Amino acid sequence: MNSLFASTARGLEELLKTELENLGAVECQVVQGGVHFKGDTRLVYQSLMWSRLASRIMLPLGECKVYSDLDLYLGVQAINWTEMFNPGATFAVHFSGLNDTIRNSQYGAMKVKDAIVDAFTRKNLPRPNVDRDAPDIRVNVWLHKETASIALDLSGDGLHLRGYRDRAGIAPIKETLAAAIVMRSGWQSGTPLLDPMCGSGTLLIEAAMLATDRAPGLHRGRWGFSGWAQHDEAIWQEVKAEAQTRARKGLAEYSSHFYGSDSDARVIQRARTNARLAGIGELITFEVKDVAQLTNPLPKGPYGTVLSNPPYGERLDSEPALIALHSLLGRIMKNQFGGWNLSLFSASPDLLSCLQLRADKQYKAKNGPLDCVQKNYHVAESTPDSKPAMVAEDYANRLRKNLKKFEKWARQEGIECYRLYDADLPEYNVAVDRYADWVVVQEYAPPKTIDAHKARQRLFDIIAATISVLGIAPNKLVLKTRERHKGKNQYQKLGEKGEFLEVTEYNAHLWVNLTDYLDTGLFLDHRIARRMLGQMSKGKDFLNLFSYTGSATVHAGLGGARSTTTVDMSRTYLEWAERNLRLNGLTRRAHRLIQADCLAWLREANEQFDLIFIDPPTFSNSKRMEDAFDVQRDHLALMKDLKRLLRAGGTIMFSNNKRGFRMDLDGLAKLGLKAQEITQKTLSQDFARNRQIHNCWLITAA
């Protein structure tokens, strides 16, 4: 009897144990990452040929304590290597694990290689050669703390390489994991199986091979036992011949069918090739088709199973499309696949909840480093009076109501950018802004007392409902998370897409960027303030401090300002402001752009202006600014400096976002200034629900 070890992906150990026992293995013991078992020589070959779940089959050779590199060398050399393989065979060493002595896996592999070579040369036998790419023998060494475990890898290449897939092809799941997904899906052999996002067809091919009794190792051309000294070619040929006979019989007797589709024509072509190489191409119909076009291939029966590994996405900007995809799949299943089963494997349980289906079973597994879940559902047959469940119904109803109200108003006002929803309902804590035919959803980060999973699921419901109510394409929705922050965090960069969208605000044309920054380049709540500046600017010299992207300057320029001066510390935003000015034909020398610390520039400037707009940060301690700034503490000093630049009869429009800001009217009076609060006049309909979003003042000489 041989003592053996079969490795597998985390989470599949019990499934592998059952499979090995069915093959005839005895004394099976599950450990993390695999199963120890025993079997005769025939069982060795059968496990290699027939295991759909094992990553590798190992023949353990021994263990040794490693307190020094010499311990490792002597421990390896103690094994009788001349009984393991002939000197004419090539070998390679795979070494994993480190300890205080062996701190580099390459060094560990070198010591093992030296010990094996010396074991042959000490017996005056030819020195075996190393072949890292295609060795006859693979030696695996695992070092855990002070113990090294040494084994022969009888598989050679990993057993997930069945021989039907081009190694250069990209596969999101290995064939061994795909087989486990099929086994856990609840699909019954002989019933239809459909994968609407099949990619290169791995799930369907593994299912078809299982259904037709085709051994997963049947198409492999190379094995790790070919150079093993104890290899019994006669028994191997018997195992191989039996597998070939069973495959022919299974294919001839199988009567059901498999269906695969994907939106990418190239991967569908690869799937067809893979299925043909696997010997089951005639059983699978592949189509180029988007999920939105998915229909039941057997509307009159029999019932079957939809099985897939849908995309899950790690980038925030991909989530809206994925949420829409899963929501759509859920609706299609309910509408067209009543009575069928559904099984999805995903790294995102939150996305699976967008299906709006209740799972009957679920399994956990690892896909490489990713924690994944497989959920199985039974889709109830629909009845004539069945009504589709609403996602985030209260939110959807409020958004629909707001849309009806604001869409007409915005059209009459001549604006393309406006707020549709602003945390109107506390449990749906987001802002929804429309930019022409795009939508930005900003999630206000939930407090730490809220369960993160529930908060994420609520956000996914919001995304699905937003796409549905507004009737937009998922790729026209941008998702952002906004935390309460200090200073001008609109300068925080989120991406590098560099995609700009031209929008209209009254008579101004402006560039916005919806993806690369936390803010978009246009503060929507200041829309009326900008219009007022345009109306006040005719024939005047205009100064815009903390200018951001210069949208207020554009309105002043279009309003007939004699000159404009735009000051900001960010080169990025000044270049943006220049683009905005150019877009509106404001290109003459009278429109100056200055990159500077606004507070320092203000103290040193000696020019005069008729109209000044300043919208400073609530707080800033930027390294590029000389001093920390607090708008509540420092606004009087700011007004003192501004007064020096204000021409007689001039006006300062002062705005900030500090909640509870208190203007020091007595202090202003001592400076010879007076203030008129115009906050309510600057709040348009879409911001009437949030009266503290900013405060705004007109300041003139007393």
From Swiss-Prot:
It catalyses: guanosine(2445) in 23S rRNA + S-adenosyl-L-methionine = N(2)-methylguanosine(2445) in 23S rRNA + S-adenosyl-L-homocysteine + H(+); guanosine(2069) in 23S rRNA + S-adenosyl-L-methionine = N(2)-methylguanosine(2069) in 23S rRNA + S-adenosyl-L-homocysteine + H(+). Its EC number is 2.1.1.173, 2.1.1.264. GO terms for cellular component: cytoplasm. It is an enzyme of class 2 (transferase). It is found in: Cytoplasm. Residues 43-154 form the THUMP domain. One of its GO terms (molecular function) is 23S rRNA (guanine(2445)-N(2))-methyltransferase activity. The keyword S-adenosyl-L-methionine applies. SUPFAM superfamilies: S-adenosyl-L-methionine-dependent methyltransferases. Gene3D superfamilies: 3.30.2130.30, RNA methyltransferase domain (HRMD) like, Vaccinia Virus protein VP39. Keywords: Cytoplasm, Methyltransferase, RNA-binding, rRNA processing, S-adenosyl-L-methionine, Transferase. Belongs to the methyltransferase superfamily. RlmKL family. PANTHER family: RIBOSOMAL RNA LARGE SUBUNIT METHYLTRANSFERASE K/L (PTHR47313), RIBOSOMAL RNA LARGE SUBUNIT METHYLTRANSFERASE K_L (PTHR47313:SF1). Specifically methylates the guanine in position 2445 (m2G2445) and the guanine in position 2069 (m7G2069) of 23S rRNA. This is Ribosomal RNA large subunit methyltransferase K/L. It comes from Shigella flexneri. The gene is rlmL.
